[in-house]
């Protein structure tokens, strides 16, 4: 559910008046939820009834995409702006739900199997994202650019997902977070997070933590901006006579293949 509409959202933006402007806005909209990732993760850790929120928020996302389906029938910028807001809200909810899942996984998987379980979860996430985007492009093609139908399909996926979780809700157990008497300031929480990450690096005997962190940030910055440039470039220069959505799927396919291939090697270079 969280991936079917990713490419379709860019294609919807390209159908607006002044498509390059709309696609540029869409590129920025996709990035906004990443600014809240740390805060959302902290809130997920503090949530006491994780299974309940995991299920209920899935139903909320289904409702959001029903609204998106209604809005995409209009080509106005007011409708586009509302879809952008709903997309941001849904992506933040998806990040929050991912944070809720981790403690449940930790509780129900033996410690010796946790790393293997994390790796398998990551693999399924990448494959699910790729399959979801491919499904979105296929639905868009057979429906002749019917954005509402794709959004409704997305809503159906969230509905089925939460309904499945509801059926096994008794098994979604986790350790209850310790209640804190005094709420820590956000700045203090960020400082503690930084110190914890630094401690992990030191345990792994990785020297010069700040330099490694800077390298990661510098590598991620251009890598994260490449897709936005492709979105604009492919408006006028699609690959091999394909349309925009199919060309974007080719790029995503190469990215997923690269990530999975890199994950197969555990050596550092």
Segment roles from a protein language model:
Residues 17-27, 119, 242-252:
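Small-residue hotspots at the loop-to-helix junctions and early N-terminal turns
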Residues 151, 155-182:
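Helix-loop junctions on the cytosolic side of multi-pass membrane transporters
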């Amino acid at each position: 559910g969280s991936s079917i509409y990713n490419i379709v959202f860019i294609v919807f933006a390209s159908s607006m008046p002044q498509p390059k402007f709309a696609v540029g806005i869409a590129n920025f909209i996709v990035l906004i939820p990443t600014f809240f990732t740390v805060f959302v993760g902290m809130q997920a850790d503090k949530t006491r009834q994780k299974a309940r929120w995991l299920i209920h928020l899935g139903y909320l996302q289904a409702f959001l995409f029903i609204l998106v389906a209604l809005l995409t029938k209009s080509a106005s910028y007011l409708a586009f702006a509302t879809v952008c807001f709903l997309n941001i809200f849904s992506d933040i909810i998806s990040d929050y739900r991912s944070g809720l899942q981790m403690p449940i996984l930790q509780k129900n998987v033996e410690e010796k199997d946790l790393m293997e379980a994390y790796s398998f979860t990551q693999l399924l996430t990448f494959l699910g994202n790729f399959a979801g985007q491919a499904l979105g492009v296929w639905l868009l093609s057979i429906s002749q650019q019917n954005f509402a139908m794709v959004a409704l399909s997305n809503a159906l996926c969230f509905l089925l997902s939460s309904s499945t979780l509801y059926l096994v809700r008794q098994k979604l157990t986790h350790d209850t977070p310790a209640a804190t008497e005094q709420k820590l300031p956000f700045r203090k929480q960020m400082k503690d997070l930084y110190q914890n990450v630094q401690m992990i690096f030191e345990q792994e005997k990785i020297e010069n933590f700040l330099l490694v962190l800077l390298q990661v940030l510098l590598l991620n910055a251009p890598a994260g901006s490449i897709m936005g440039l492709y979105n604009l470039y492919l408006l006028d220069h699609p690959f091999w006579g394909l349309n925009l959505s199919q060309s974007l799927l080719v790029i995503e396919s190469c990215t997923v293949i690269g990530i999975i291939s890199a994950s197969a090697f555990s050596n550092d270079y």
